[in-house]
UniProtKB/Swiss-Prot annotation:
GO BP terms, alphabetized: cilium assembly; cilium movement; determination of left/right symmetry; outer dynein arm assembly
Gene symbol of the encoding locus: Dnai2
Gene3D superfamilies: YVTN repeat-like/Quinoprotein amine dehydrogenase (2.130.10.10)
Lineage: superkingdom: Eukaryota
Main location: cytoplasm
Residue stretches of biased makeup (Basic residues): 570-579
Any one GO molecular function term: microtubule motor activity
Key words, A-Z: Cell projection, Cilium, Cilium biogenesis/degradation, Cytoplasm, Cytoskeleton, Dynein, Microtubule, Motor protein, Repeat, WD repeat
Family matches, as PANTHER family: DYNEIN AXONEMAL INTERMEDIATE CHAIN 2 (PTHR12442:SF7), DYNEIN INTERMEDIATE CHAIN (PTHR12442)
Family: Belongs to the dynein intermediate chain family.
Protein name: Dynein axonemal intermediate chain 2
Function: Part of the dynein complex of respiratory cilia.
UniProt source species: Mus musculus
Quaternary context: Consists of at least two heavy chains and a number of intermediate and light chains. Interacts with DNAAF2. Interacts with DNAAF6/PIH1D3. Interacts with HEATR2; probably involved in outer arm dynein assembly. Interacts with CFAP53.
């Protein structure tokens, strides 16, 4: 602060005005030192000197401007979408536009403003102010930052008995809060005194949770409502669906009945993009997918059984352990099962059997993560056993890309929301792997040891800068990745698209080749079977010939006996057989026996001729 003091004096009191001029320096007086006084000089040693040890203090004042902070809301209506219209739904936006364009007020306003804006529109069309004149020149290469990540905060389970952080969910407005579900998924190993609470954490206060959610059973999943940030949806360990409203407190606001709920833990819950913002669906290891409306959550709206044989039998259903839904594909959803099979379903199908569209086989164990690429929905990521795989809906027999088999089991995975070629995976050894397909495809671009405990789940923030990882002991670690991993690179979309298309074409070629090989093997097997059938047919022919011979001789002897019986009936008196006839019959029987032993065939005419000759001889003999 400047201090000014004004001195007042009359001009007459100033005296005569000085007139200065430049001149050479001159010596006026020179006093020489006195030698006698110099001889009396004695140096004193030691000398006592006073010193001020304390710091010099002075009074200072500063006047600063104070900024007062307060929270306030603004209701912006003009130019925005209504609350019941989802901007991401193309059909809803088109329907709303058509409705507005038919309004008379809108037509009159456009007609009045058209003449005013016509001049400005012509100016904009005359010159392209956004034209880039040096776009063809090569850009100067800028050194990119190396991939890195650092720990920002750690949120620990406040309970004494530690539980697993099973699921994470970011606050939809600003991502200022993080909801964490805690549970013990080890079968029949949960302690009797284990607490069931789950928490909502403020990112700036890791010491104490902001809100505690108190369910009747431990929560396995927990999701924020994207349209109402005060509402949360949870899936319980006992199969029930619970709903909270943070404005009403920590207790459950809505709860499904046990009779109409799942029979096993609910591993997946997702909100649907509806007008009301109250519809959701869930999946469980009991093999059922259920649709709910939280306004009437006592029983589900619809149930689909995950029976890939399409017989709708619950005992044959595959247990669902992960769930995927993309808002741009409102009729489709995908389910990852315990058996390592991905089931693609269509909710709007007419029958229950038609709702299961196709299946993808690729993992040896449960599929813990399933997510579509946010830029290319036809490609989706699955994480299970020791690998992470990338699939295409056009190639169903095998995945188009996959990681190598790791030494540790993989527990979760997710795509980056800002970069189409980046995804994240967590492992049971506490490691977070960040994969960049543009930079490197065989190994992760960054592998970070987050903690010593096994990592169980992860969730990426919407802007891609922050990653939350939950461990088996309930510790949630918040990580911040470098700008190179959270910023869209130049031409990355085109590069990622070309990579996916190239691998899809390669898999289609391999599938066609394998199909041809299978057909050839099938033809060889069928040829061998035909040869075996011919050999068996030849053997069967000999057996049939022998059987035919036996049946033929049986018919002959039965016919002979019948004729003899008829001949005896025609004769009035029985006559004694002559020795000649007896000898003839014995000769016939001997000849027939010899023919049977030799394998020959005797005709009926030959037998009749022999019997006639025997009759003639009998007539010649006198009685």
């Amino acid at each position: 602060m400047e201090i000014v003091y004004v001195y007042l004096k009359k001009r007459s009191e100033f005296g005569k005005q000085c007139n200065f001029s430049d001149r050479q320096a001159e010596l006026n007086i020179d006093i020489l030192p006195n030698p006698e006084l110099a001889a009396l000089y004695v140096e004193r040693n030691p000398v006592d000197t006073g010193i001020q040890c304390s710091a010099s203090m002075s009074e200072h004042e500063a006047n600063t401007e104070r900024f007062e902070m307060e929270s306030c809301g603004v209701n912006h209506v003009e130019g925005g979408w209504p609350k019941d219209v989802n901007p991401q739904e193309l059909e809803q936006t088109i329907r709303f536009r058509k409705k507005v364009e038919k309004d008379e007020n809108y037509i009159n306003a456009v007609m009045q403003l058209g003449s005013i804006m016509e001049h400005c529109i012509k100016q904009n069309n005359a010159i392209d102010i956004y034209e880039e004149y040096f776009d063809d020149e090569e850009a100067v290469e800028v050194t990119e930052e190396a991939p890195s990540a650092k720990t920002i905060n750690v949120f620990r389970d406040p309970q004494e008995i530690k539980r697993t952080a099973t699921h994470l969910s970011w606050h939809p407005d600003g991502n200022r809060k993080l909801a964490v579900a805690y549970s013990c998924l080890k079968f029949q190993r949960a302690p009797m005194s284990m607490n069931y609470d789950s928490y909502i954490w403020d990112l700036e206060n890791p010491n104490r949770p902001e809100i505690a959610l108190k369910p009747l059973s431990p929560l396995v999943t927990l999701e924020y409502n994207p349209k109402d940030s005060h509402v949360l949806l949870g899936g319980c360990y006992n199969g029930q669906i619970a709903c909270w409203d943070t404005r009403k407190g920590s207790l459950v606001a809505e709860l499904s009945t046990i009779e109409f709920s799942h029979r096993d833990p609910v591993y997946g819950t997702i909100w649907l993009q509806s007008k009301t913002g109250t519809e959701c669906f869930s999946a469980s290891t009991d093999g059922q997918v259920m649709w709910w409306d939280i306004r009437k959550i006592s029983e589900p709206i619809e149930v689909v059984i995950m029976d890939i044989s399409r017989k709708e039998q619950l005992e044959n259903a595959l247990g669902a352990i992960s769930l995927e839904f993309e808002s741009t594909l409102p009729t489709k959803f995908m389910v990852g099962t315990e058996q390592g099979i991905v089931i693609s379903c269509n909710r709007k199908a007419k029958t229950q059997a038609e709702k299961i569209v196709c299946t993808f086989y690729g993992h040896h164990g449960p599929i813990y993560a399933l997510q579509r690429n946010p830029f290319y929905p036809k490609n989706f990521l699955t994480v299970g056993d020791w690998t992470a795989r990338i699939w295409s809906e056009d190639s169903r027999e095998s995945s188009i890309m996959w990681t190598k088999y790791h030494m540790a089991y993989l527990s979760d995975g997710a795509w980056s929301p800002v970069r189409p070629a980046v995804f994240f995976t967590t492992k049971m050894d506490g490691t977070l792997d960040i994969w960049d397909l543009v930079f490197k495809q065989c190994d992760p671009a960054l592998s970070l040891k987050v903690c010593d405990d096994p990592l169980f789940c992860l969730r990426v923030q919407d802007n891609g800068c922050l990653i939350a990882c939950g461990s088996e002991l309930g510790t949630t670690t918040l990580l911040e990745v470098s700008s190179s991993l959270s910023t869209l690179q130049r031409n990355e979309k085109n590069i990622a698209s070309s990579i996916f298309e190239r691998e899809t074409r390669r898999e289609k070629i391999l599938e066609a080749r394998h199909r041809e090989m299978r057909l050839k093997e099938k033809g060889k097997v069928e040829g061998k079977e035909d040869d075996q059938k011919e050999e068996e047919a030849a053997l069967d022919l000999d057996e049939l010939v022998g059987k035919a011979e036996e049946e033929f001789f049986e018919v002959i002897f039965s016919e002979l006996k019948r004729k003899e019986a008829e001949a005896l009936k025609k004769k009035p008196k029985p006559r004694k057989k002559s020795s000649v006839k007896v000898e003839a019959e014995e000769e016939v029987e001997e000849n027939v026996g010899e023919e049977e032993e030799a394998g020959g065939i005797i005709g009926i005419d030959a037998v009749e001729d022999m019997s006639e000759e025997a009759g003639e001889e009998q007539e010649d003999v006198p009685t």
